Swiss-Prot record:
This is Urease subunit gamma. Its main location: cytoplasm. CDD domains: Urease_gamma. One of its GO terms (biological process) is urea catabolic process. It catalyses: urea + 2 H2O + H(+) = hydrogencarbonate + 2 NH4(+). The gene is ureA. It is an enzyme of class 3 (hydrolase). It comes from Cereibacter sphaeroides (strain ATCC 17025 / ATH 2.4.3). SUPFAM superfamilies: Urease, gamma-subunit. GO terms for molecular function: nickel cation binding; urease activity. The lineage of its organism: Bacteria, Pseudomonadati, Pseudomonadota, Alphaproteobacteria, Rhodobacterales. Belongs to the urease gamma subunit family. Pathway: Nitrogen metabolism; urea degradation; CO(2) and NH(3) from urea (urease route): step 1/1.
Length: 100
């Protein structure tokens, strides 16, 4: 299978999000990379489903709660930026204050 660097990045984010979901199901708190991966995957999949940029910016801030993360992680994440492919092209989506 020949994947472009962009496709490899998307696959890695997706895999990290799967790991994060499994850890949440077991009650394990997420670290910084896991939290970013879960939010990023939510945005990428939402774009694929046809949701709007504005909708994903707002909804992305409600994917993870502060109590689901390790201490200090919510304070470290001021924003998450993801390039996502929408029906009308690729756009940069910024989720401000993603963990509340």
């Amino acid at each position: 299978m020949n994947l472009t660097p962009r496709e490899k990045d998307k696959l890695l984010i997706s895999l990290a999000a799967i790991v994060a979901r499994n850890r949440l199901e077991r009650g394990v708190r997420l670290n910084h990379p896991e939290a970013v991966a879960l939010i990023s995957d939510f945005v990428v999949e939402g774009a694929r489903e046809g949701r709007s940029v504005a909708d994903l910016m707002q909804a992305g801030a409600h994917v993870i709660r502060a109590e689901q993360c390790m201490e200090g992680v919510p304070e470290m994440l001021h924003s998450v930026q993801v390039e996502a492919t929408f029906p009308d092209g690729t756009k940069l989506v910024t989720v401000h204050h993603p963990i509340r």
